[in-house]
């Protein structure tokens, strides 16, 4: 979903604005939240170089992020985990920077105005295609494992 929506940015004459963000990036987050609510899972987007501090890596995410950094071919990791005392499985999926991502995550000085204004503490820039942008983290409680 993310790749398909981001591809709509390619070849644009004007820089992305808040409206484009709402059509390209926001739907991915909204879909993740909907799936999480529907199934009782926790779904997060996390990154070391985040735009929003709420998306900072936790200790487990930092460990998995280092694994992804060390092995560009590694796309996913499952771990036994617990959240707030609840045992379960945690699935991590890498987010790899694509050329279309550079419209907002490329050179610091080339970021769209809405990004600079909305995210004054932004650290999600100066990426290149193929870089690790971050990861999706999905926690599935044992009590829900195998249930659809």
How should each PLM-predicted stretch be described?
Residues 1-98, 110-148:
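Extracytoplasmic c-type cytochrome modules immediately beyond a signal peptide or single-pass transmembrane anchor
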Residues 102-109:
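Detector for the c-type heme attachment site
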